[in-house]
């Protein structure tokens, strides 16, 4: 009755209901362990199946719109690296300059599992031009800023945007924050008129583009750093139109 009321009367989303069921189950389990109750009533509650929501990747046009409004070399390097490698934002911020070996990049993944990913020509050129303007000695590909940069009133409009070219405003050590990357992508999406272009959507876009161009799903899974192939299959869920086109191409 409680769950039905939460869904019908309170219009609570299914993920919230699922969490509440889990919390209540833990609470009654504790009560049972303390012998306050004899049986956990939540054991009879069936799990609610969440409807599968398809998460879209960016279209080719949306990707080009993002590229068209990039403001500087750092923004372009961030955008192209995410699109080319499909790495997580937590992995992007950890990349050092020595992790890059030509087109190959060493990624420090989840659970201390390293892997190599690869840069396409656009990403390699973007990183090269970006590093040419860097004059600091910070080891990270995308370093963090010093506290002084928070006050930019003394800088020219150009310098306010390209503070990272001035060593005095770059941390001697330490990488850019994940939140900063997300903010950069959020502003880029607004300028481009693209709905949502966060780092995770770029990761999905990289994977989806690779699959559409014929990259085997096992290789895509390895590129993304997935332990299970089923995780990659969720990322690469095809639309009905894409499935229909694939059927025409591959099924006689």
Question: What is each of the regions a protein language model found here?
Answer:
Residues 1-54:
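N-terminal core-binding DNA-recognition domain of tyrosine recombinases/integrases
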Residues 100-102, 195-196, 215-234, 241, ...:
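Short, polar N-cap/turn motifs at the start of nucleic acid-interacting alpha helices
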Residues 80, 84, 187, 203-227:
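C-terminal catalytic core of tyrosine-transesterase DNA break-rejoin enzymes
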Residues 34-65, 108-110, 147-149, 168-171:
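Flexible interdomain linker/hinge and immediately adjacent N-terminus
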Residues 122, 129, 238-252:
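DNA/chromatin major-groove-contacting recognition/catalytic segments
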Residues 37, 51-53, 60-89, 113:
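Basic, Lys/Arg- and aromatic-enriched nucleic-acid-binding interface segment
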Residues 85, 90, 94-129, 147, ...:
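Conserved tyrosine-mediated DNA breakage-rejoining catalytic core shared by Y-recombinases
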Residues 120-194:
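Active-site/catalytic core of tyrosine-dependent DNA strand-transfer enzymes
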